[in-house]
Amino acid sequence: DIVALSVATRPDCVDDNVLKLLEKLNKIKPVWVELGLQTIKESSVDYIRRGYENSVYVDTATKLRNIGIEVITHIILGLPNESKLDMLRSVDFACKYSDGIKLQLLHILKGTDLLKDYEDSKFNALTMEQYINILCDAVSIIPKNVIIHRLTGDGDKKILVAPLWSGNKKVVL
């Protein structure tokens, strides 16, 4: 038996028709929607080509929660040129509109534009110590009513360039 439905999407892909469908499904089985916010820092939003304003996330998350659907927000820690404070601001912002949060380390993968900037020394990947430090501070500001669904992830080892330590997430956990 299906116990619940979890949908991961972009906030700009949730139009009124999708909302109606999700609301209908939520009456049959619980529905969770994971929204990819990644960051709220505008220069980072442009850099990663997210493609929508923070207000689109807020609008979609609010509409989903208003119809009884739990929202889980995805945040990437370690984006180029983001300070620890920038990352914590994104976490804090996401928690205002979420029932859950997924925290993900930035992975630099082969065949990406990000790799070129990394190889050109435009930014450094986080060390494990930096990531754990940021993660601990992030966890400390997440309200008790917001479920932490992920503390880290592991990139595909065949294409992972950096940080290589992230290939073994058990070490991080």
Where are the regions that the model predicts?
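Auxiliary Fe-S-binding modules of radical SAM enzymes
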Residues: 97, 107-173
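Alpha-helix N-cap and loop-to-helix initiation/capping positions
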Residues: 48-56, 82-89, 122-130, 168
